[in-house]
Amino acid sequence: AEGRFRGQIVPIEVTNEDGTTSVFDKDEGIRSDTSMEKLAGLKPSFKPDGLITAGNSSQISDGAPAVLIMERETAGRLGLRPRARFVSFAVAGADPIFMLTAPIPATAKVLRKAGLTLDQVDLVEINEAFASVPLAWQRETGADMSKVNVNGGAVAIGHPLGASGARLTTVLLNELERTGGRFGLQT
């Protein structure tokens, strides 16, 4: 409603199936007309008695990212001012039986490498394909959820295949700048 993503999306004119044109300038998955009652009425997606529904999993959406990453020296030589600096990276795997829990060991690993604690992190963007991902992560880390996916995650705004990482980076960077935060964590 506030238009926080407006500066992060390049408007593109598209031709619709019926031949008309429209401007694609906002995330297509946002459902402002949803309610808790509508979500509670959705049928399970995978098993008749399952818990995963279209309401607690991300939809596949369109997206094509572009980010420019370079060394500080290169930016200086080109006359560009860096907006952020990557402090550390980490990769971790998890048992596929407990699907989508890899952000838990990855968080511990990257914070250890960066010499930071979770309390020092201002904002967190978790790439959650299902609502259970940040919930499991929070249970293990004890993180303050008021810092997590503060403008909505993939369940709320979409999961563009091949664009998720760049979308998370862009959202995190812009929100850190907007709020004056210093450290962000992206999974």
Give the positions of each predicted feature.
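N-terminal extracellular/periplasmic Venus flytrap/periplasmic-binding protein-like
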Residues: A1-R77, E140-K147
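Structured core elements
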Residues: P11, Q59, V67-I69, R85, ...
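Generic structural signal for well-ordered, non-membrane alpha-helical segments
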Residues: F5, S32-S35, S57-S61, P96, ...
